[in-house]
């Protein structure tokens, strides 16, 4: 008889095998991080259930099991080895194992030796990720599978971490997307994460076995894997227990059950962990703290029987919905704070129903709504005003502290911070796409440890040694918490430590403050997270100042919206908001349709509310609403795409030559097009990127850490092969053209050398002539000779004269292209000056004009009636200046020069586009920010990736415009 234990990140599995390796007992239980207690409990139970188990050979495996195994003297079997042993025993001939656990994901390639791919520090695409998403959708985890089977369409959702995914999903929910479609999209995201992130370019083929909880319980998830891989994998009986079975199969010695149970019970960590000072020394100090904060109080009056003027404010937030009713004096007549449960419209209706039920005769003079769900709620209930949430929170903060210098709002999954200068918002910080440091971050931890958030927060108030967890992402923090637990930290220490880490993350990761002093001394804190006294105390300790936390900290967005409605109406008139009769007749119907008005073919979610009111979501431009094509005459991004489209293929005797429309080719295509057309090739480029194109090359991406624009190259190359290209030209280019803006003119390493990655990771590239040699376009004098040497190897009939002539015309073509871009940019600027429009420099890289990379951000911004130019239009206008960093990259030198020029103009603002995974941008963003802020310009950064929902982008742009209005 053999017994195996698998101690995973979230659950413990225990099996007993008989002498013929048949499973005779199994158990599968969640341990809520109380690992030792649970092991003791399971071993005691097994002993009562199975006769003779005391003589069984015992071994232990699993990601959380090594420390326990060492301390109690049980053999530890590495889990990958255990899985392989079990697979070879029970399913001989297995080629690939895909295993998803609670927080870990693995692919085991068993053919031709063992090769293992595991997730490192990110739990994206694992069971914990699906768990989080189920919570967000407000459905039971076990219902996710059935829900996904009912899908009609899918959305693009990032699965690298739960936080990115929330950034995608929350706006979809707020816009009325069907939960079944989102559930299927979540499963597709998990597949995408596993295939692209773990396989890293190696093909998944042969006999595939699915293991682990998510793949065992969710048949639709297995179907998603099958569809993506073009195969039919098997999920064996007892797939949950393969690691435990493998451990049992490797067990070689018996144990003394009583002794092991006793040792496990008494297992304690070393007690060696870094810790901070306590939040409160004693109850008395805590009481003083509570009394001080009780002074920032909003007076409350009864709504029932109130006959004066009333103002309604609503905040449809990312995870919660808030509503308030105020009187003329700003006193609170009624308030509601509820989870949105993925349906802000229904919750807002509930709020209004309650208001009318308490006071059927209420005289609502004006109303306003803010937050992620602003647009849909405004349409649904005919609310008078919409207000961007940054301004709503600022309005509320001023009510409590008119001379406020700094406001920080920590909500469910977003952090908003504003610096105030001369009574106006001077600078805005929003968390890009990471919610460590937000309310949901704490909630996730509390739930994982088996606590309600309110109880969990209180635990940390008097902790003696709050763990120093640093300021890290949720998943990194998971490993830190586990390590601290192993080292003997108590739940109280961990609770206090997490509160401190939230604050540090907000201050040093989001705001990127070098010290708390630069934020000012007059601070208002708001957002539901600050109702947590531990977080508030940690913030005051870190800042070194006493701050103001209103007693309605969680309602400040709605309160600010109500104050805004009051100010706009001047206390006169009647609100258009749906009245009691209208609510009784209220309907909300959702249907899905394809737009079809342009190549994007956006999947639209159409919300109808009766009486002709509609809200359309999922559109990347206003065309489905206005029925007109967007005006592109003042949009440089649109102009550049049209310019590239003007280069049509010309038949050539040397065959079809394809160029991937990716990375630097968005700028260099005119050069190479003319060069090879003159050499008698039929030159064409791959289509602009789409989601489908990305997926065509996804399985060959060798690293998930590379930026999204680089990942797209694989899809472009595969598409060119499918389009019948005989030759694919994608050269390595260490240098770019010298524009005399910086100290040198390198391309970044990814742009320069990605062709090498393609050559070594795409099997199909061998089907065509692939030219990826190194070329030096920055040296016009010796380019023809070097190009001839490289190309004549592939095309021996080429002559040096042909290449010389083609090169001469190619340089002319590139110069013509640059002139057209500059001329068009100058035309846009001149027209904007004449019409008095704001000019936005949308600064990024050449490839940021790719519609799949920018997700229509240019069209969204131009919808605010501003002119858009790119950084290369204004960079030549700047005088040469010294930067604080080594200015050696062409694209980055443009950014710095553009930022410098923008500081010299009152009518220009710079918005920087940054792709996730761009290492060099860690430097450029700080430098661009410094250049702009040195002349009191607002720095706005938009991080883009596979995420397609522009809700957060819209908030950022509207906040910038609102700050400029108040300037």
Task: Please provide the spans of the model-predicted regions.
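Short glycine-rich, Thr/Ser-proximal phosphate-binding strand/loop in the N-terminal lobe
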Residues: 4-44, 115-116, 120, 314-353, ...
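Glycine-rich phosphate-binding loop plus the immediately following alpha-helix
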Residues: 34-35, 112-153, 161, 239-243, ...
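Glycine-rich phosphate-binding loops at beta-strand->alpha-helix junctions
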Residues: 64, 199-228, 239-243, 370-373, ...
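Acidic, glycine/GT-rich loop-and beta-edge segments that sit at the periphery of enzyme/chaperone cores
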Residues: 106, 253-309, 416, 567-632
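An N-terminal assembly and electron-transfer interface module characteristic of large anaerobic redox
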Residues: 119, 123-130, 348, 434-442, ...
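Glycine-rich phosphate-binding/hydrolytic loop that grips phosphoryl groups
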Residues: 127-132, 237-270, 395, 439-444, ...
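Adenine-nucleotide phosphate-binding core of ATP-dependent small-molecule kinases
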Residues: 165-196, 479-508
